[in-house]
């Protein structure tokens, strides 16, 4: 994947403002609420019975932060995303058996969260760069499935 200087700047510029804990928690919570079938991968997280329970669940919050922290690895390694996510792809495929479609869904949710948090900075150009990034990350995570 080729990244223009402008795309790199739009991605890293916005990333520098992201509160990883808050945005990660919100993104994962939204995934579990909007796409309830994804909850089956998080059975060990306890109470996921309602949006309120999900939003208040400390395990959802912690894992959301973990997910978005690893997303930061993509931002730091834009030219090597495939290798950056090789181990995570293996884990999600071989051990967790996560449907790779969920990576795309989470990417789309992250776009929504970023747009909600950064209304002024999240221009159409910024969205295009981030949409490309979440697509590349989802593809890298799904790589082990092919």
Swiss-Prot record:
It comes from the Eukaryota. CDD domains: Hb-beta-like. One of its GO terms (biological process) is hydrogen peroxide catabolic process. One of its GO terms (cellular component) is hemoglobin complex. Pfam families: Globin. Transmembrane segments: none annotated. The keyword Transport applies. InterPro entries: Globin, Globin-like_sf, Globin/Proto, Hemoglobin_b, Hemoglobin_oxygen_transport. Residues 2-146 form the Globin domain. The keyword Heme applies. Keywords: Heme, Iron, Metal-binding, Oxygen transport, Transport. Heme b binds at residues 63, 92. Red blood cells. PROSITE patterns: GLOBIN. SUPFAM superfamilies: Globin-like. GO terms for molecular function: haptoglobin binding; heme binding; metal ion binding; organic acid binding; oxygen binding; oxygen carrier activity; peroxidase activity. Belongs to the globin family. Involved in oxygen transport from the lung to the various peripheral tissues. Heterotetramer of two alpha chains and two beta chains. This is Hemoglobin subunit beta. It comes from Struthio camelus (Common ostrich).
């Amino acid at each position: 994947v080729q990244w223009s200087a402008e795309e790199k700047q739009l991605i890293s510029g916005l990333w520098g403002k992201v509160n990883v804990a808050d945005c990660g928690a919100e993104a994962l919570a939204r995934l579990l609420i909007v796409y309830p079938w994804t909850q089956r991968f998080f059975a060990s997280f306890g109470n996921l019975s309602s949006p309120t329970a999900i939003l208040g669940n400390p395990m959802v919050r912690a894992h959301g932060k973990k997910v978005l922290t690893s997303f930061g690895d993509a931002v730091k390694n834009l030219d090597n995303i495939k290798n950056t996510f090789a181990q995570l792809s293996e884990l999600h495929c071989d051990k967790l058996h996560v449907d790779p479609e969920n990576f795309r869904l989470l990417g789309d949710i992250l776009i929504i969260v970023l747009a909600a948090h950064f209304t002024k900075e999240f221009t159409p150009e910024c969205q295009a760069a981030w949409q490309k990034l979440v697509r590349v990350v989802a593809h890298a995570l799904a790589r082990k499935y092919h």
